Regions:
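A structural signal for short hydrophobic beta-strand segments in well-ordered beta-sheet cores
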Residues: 44-46, 93-94, 197
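Cysteine/selenocysteine-centered motifs that mediate thiol-based redox chemistry or coordinate metal-sulfur cofactors
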Residues: 142-154, 230-247
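Amphipathic alpha-helical effector-binding/dimerization core
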Residues: 49-50, 54-151
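Extended hydrophobic
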Residues: 159-232
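Amphipathic alpha-helical regulatory segments at dimerization interfaces
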Residues: 23, 74-86, 137, 173, ...
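N-terminal helix-turn-helix
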Residues: 1-74, 234-242
Length: 247
């Protein structure tokens, strides 16, 4: 509750401990303990010369990440909703955090079963279509840093890459086809296709995906679904400022 206090979030706090103790209605000794914990985790930094505290690097990074994620979500909502309406399949948008993806939007189609990809859910990026779409658009050295050895690979269903070499092959196929795929890697009986969403820096800021019951689509339906997914990914990237080739 202390962290949510509206007057705590200032870039600098003059006479920090006294001000915070008064505003929060807690003893100064408790304030010192809280500030030490926040400083230890990089959330605040001590400004000795000014006898004050400022926002730490971790807080700045979290704020920047939230700002980016919030904008992506706002822009993506209508695009994803229309895609789900057009295809009749469940859709979602996810962002990369470490070697996991976090689902930030989920749009459920009518008469389709619920998925594990609810908003806020984290899953290993190497197993998900959204994660693979993002990873395939990152520099290879960045992917290797996220997945340096076999120990970095977790498993859900026994399917999916289990080593850096296998992941590299999976991502190479994604780059070749322009689509990331997973077939029961996350949940048995469900398949997903995904594309990377890029921002104005040509950075893969998110993955856009559709998930459907395995074997429920005819080949021509799958082709149509992929086409609509690609067009939606291109539109969303354009809306986020991407200007390069997105085909």
């Amino acid at each position: 509750p202390y962290a949510r206090h509206p007057r705590v979030h200032r870039e600098q706090w003059s006479d920090a401990s006294h001000t915070l103790a008064r505003e929060l209605g807690i003893p100064r000794s408790t304030v010192y303990q809280l500030l030490e914990i926040l400083e230890r985790h990089g959330l605040v930094t001590r400004l000795a010369e000014q006898r004050a505290y400022g926002i730490g690097l971790k807080t700045f990074e979290l704020g920047s990440a939230y700002s980016r994620q919030h904008r992506v979500s706002q822009v993506a909502h209508p695009v994803l909703a229309r895609l789900v309406d057009e295809t009749g399949e469940n859709g979602h948008l996810a962002v990369l955090h470490g070697n996991e993806i976090i689902y930030v939007i989920e749009e459920r189609a009518a008469h389709r079963p619920p998925l594990v990809s609810g908003v806020g859910v984290r899953l290993p990026s190497h197993l998900t279509a959204t994660g693979r779409a993002i990873l395939s658009a990152l520099p290879r050295n960045q992917v290797r840093a996220l997945y340096p050895n076999r120990q970095a690979f977790t498993d859900r269903t026994g399917i999916g890459p289990k080593s850096p070499k296998e992941l590299e092959a999976t991502l190479a196929e994604t780059q070749r086809t322009g689509f990331a795929e997973e077939h029961g890697d996350v949940t048995p009986g469900f398949d997903s296709y995904a594309v990377a969403v890029r921002d104005y820096n040509d950075f893969p800021i998110a993955g856009l995906a559709l998930t459907f019951v395995s074997g429920s689509l005819r080949p021509e339906q799958e082709r149509s679904l992929k086409t609509k997914l690609r067009l939606a990914g291109t539109e969303l990237s354009r809306r986020l400022g991407a200007v390069g080739s997105l085909t």
